[in-house]
């Protein structure tokens, strides 16, 4: 036992190490972080993890998910953490003496909105009194409800997935994300069901009346926190004035599309107090799962909602606070083990 402990201490720093990869996409430099487990396998599962609005690739791994690389090492997963486009918008505030001061803040996002509204531009995504976000430099003539960048993130993520699938022996591929990253993950599942085998959307309900449905079967876990006011799982109206599709509508449409024949409702008390609805015996043996955590808000299961707004040294060019180490992967086990089992 002591020998195992000493070996773990020797290799622990390498378990959490990642490589930063930069590629050219659509005339711009884009980057992602790559984690490869120490265990060698004939075939790996690939997981792509997408940070939330104003998050970072390294912040998603370190804080948002409670140190996802620990789970990836445990399961022998190859993980990619893409970085969303970001900029530093200015805003007005006051100094301690009450004098006006102009400051800047880091803002990042994934463009899930562009493809969703392409043929539905008349759908109203927010109330007139909504809290509008600073427009991204890549956006031209977008209305006040449009709060993401306007680059082709769908193709960027697809390009990464195909690149990794070519470079490594990949069995199955999955995409997951939190909030804006969850919205993007669901969109990727809708657009590329031939490339990905499953989606995990955490607190990322898509816009009301715009939530996408894939043309081909793909497994989905969609998770919401009952106390979430930012992107509520059961109500259309959010605290910020944006309109979101309730979880029950999304899973109803997906399960109907994939001809799911059976449904199972469960109450879970460990590791979280949650209600789960599982749709199974669907086309291609996919499963659709809705999870609502009764005691959680806008966060990854088991993690508080203020985590992930940071960066680690591997992304030192980002002007942001440095991430702390969080080692709490019960939420990742809770979600990923369910997806892998079905």
Each language-model region and where it sits:
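Sec-dependent N-terminal signal peptides
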Residues: 3-13
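A domain-start/cap signature at the N-terminus of enzymes
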Residues: 14-46, 54, 58-78, 149, ...
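Serine-hydrolase catalytic machinery in alpha/beta-hydrolase-like enzymes
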Residues: 23-33, 42-174, 187, 191, ...
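Acidic glycine-/aspartate-rich tracts in secreted/extracellular proteins
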Residues: 39-40, 53-55, 85-88, 227-229, ...
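Alpha/beta-hydrolase fold active-site loops
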Residues: 44-47, 218-219, 288
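Cell-envelope and extracellular/periplasmic
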Residues: 50-55, 162, 168-169, 178-180, ...
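The feature captures the conserved acid-bearing segment of alpha/beta-hydrolase catalytic domains
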Residues: 73, 197-285, 292-295
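Alpha/beta-hydrolase-fold serine-hydrolase catalytic core, especially in secreted/extracellular enzymes
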Residues: 134, 139-141, 255-342
């Amino acid at each position: 036992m002591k020998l195992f402990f000493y070996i773990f201490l020797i290799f622990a720093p390498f378990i959490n190490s990642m490589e930063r990869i930069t590629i050219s996409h659509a005339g711009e430099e884009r980057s992602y972080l790559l984690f490869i487990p120490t265990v060698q396998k004939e075939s790996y599962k690939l997981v792509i993890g997408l940070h939330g609005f104003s998050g970072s690739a390294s912040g998603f791994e370190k804080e948002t998910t409670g140190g996802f690389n620990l789970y990836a090492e445990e399961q022998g997963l190859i993980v990619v953490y893409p970085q969303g486009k970001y900029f530093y918008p200015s805003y007005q505030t006051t100094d301690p003496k009450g004098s006006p001061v102009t400051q800047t803040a880091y803002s990042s996002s994934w463009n899930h909105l562009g493809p969703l509204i392409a043929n539905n531009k008349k759908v109203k995504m927010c109330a007139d009194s909504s809290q509008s976000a600073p427009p991204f430099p890549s956006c031209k003539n977008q209305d006040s409800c449009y709060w993401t960048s306007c680059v082709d993130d769908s193709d960027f993520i697809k390009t990464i997935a195909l690149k990794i699938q070519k470079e490594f022996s990949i069995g199955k591929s999955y995409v997951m994300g939190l909030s804006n990253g969850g919205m993007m993950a669901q969109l990727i599942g809708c657009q590329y069901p031939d490339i990905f085998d499953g989606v995990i959307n955490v607190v990322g309900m898509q816009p009301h009346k715009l939530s996408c449905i894939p043309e081909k079967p793909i497994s989905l876990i969609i998770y919401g926190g009952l106390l979430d006011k930012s992107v509520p799982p059961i109500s259309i109206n959010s605290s910020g004035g944006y309109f979101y599709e309730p979880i029950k509508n999304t899973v109803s449409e997906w399960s109907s599309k994939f001809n799911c024949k059976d449904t199972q409702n469960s109450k879970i008390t460990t590791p979280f107090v949650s209600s789960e609805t599982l749709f199974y015996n669907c086309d291609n043996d996919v499963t659709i799962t809705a999870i609502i955590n009764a005691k959680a808000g806008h966060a990854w299961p088991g993690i508080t909602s203020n985590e992930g707004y940071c960066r680690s040294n591997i992304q030192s060019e980002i002007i942001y606070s440095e991430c702390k180490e969080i080692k709490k992967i019960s939420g990742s086990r809770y979600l990923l083990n369910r997806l892998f089992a079905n």
